[in-house]
Amino acid sequence: MPTVEHFEISADDVERAQKFYKDVFGWTMQKWSERENLGQEYWFFETKDDKGSPGIGGGMMKRQDPSQGITNYVTVSSIDEYSSKIEQSGGKVMVPKTKVSDMGFIAVCLDSENNSFGLFEYAAQSKQ
């Protein structure tokens, strides 16, 4: 069963947002230099529970659109297959399958209630 594996936080002021999440949750962020090749700065971070066990990984970037908030990414075996399922079930694919460096592919969708979420497919799984 596909599961949420990554979430992305959009921020108007990335430094301020990083400080907020560090002060509140202890999350430290590491810049992903490879993403700069796509014309966008991006930071990764890992979450952990109170005992130090790893949680869902996250990322942060500068907000591109006023309506952009937090996006949860569900890892799937095939974005093409799940995009079709989404549309057949009353959802919409807003950003079609897009390559993200050598890691894999993403797509951004809306569910039947207009909530946005992302799909992620590892490159090793992809037939492109």
What is each of the regions a protein language model found here?
Residues D65-S89:
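Mid-chain, well-packed structural core segment of small domains
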Residues E36-E41, P66-Q68, V100-F105:
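Short acidic/glycine-enriched loop/turn segments that link adjacent beta-strands
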Residues P2, E8-P54:
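Core segments of cupin and vicinal oxygen chelate
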Residues Y42, G57, I106-V108:
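Short hydrophobic/aromatic beta-strand element in the GNAT-like acyltransferase core
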Residues K51-I56, N115-F117:
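Short, charged/polar, Gly/Pro-enriched secondary-structure boundary elements
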Residues P2, I9, D23, Q30-E34, ...:
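Vicinal oxygen chelate
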Residues T3-F7, I56, Q68-N72, F105:
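Short amphipathic alpha-helical segments
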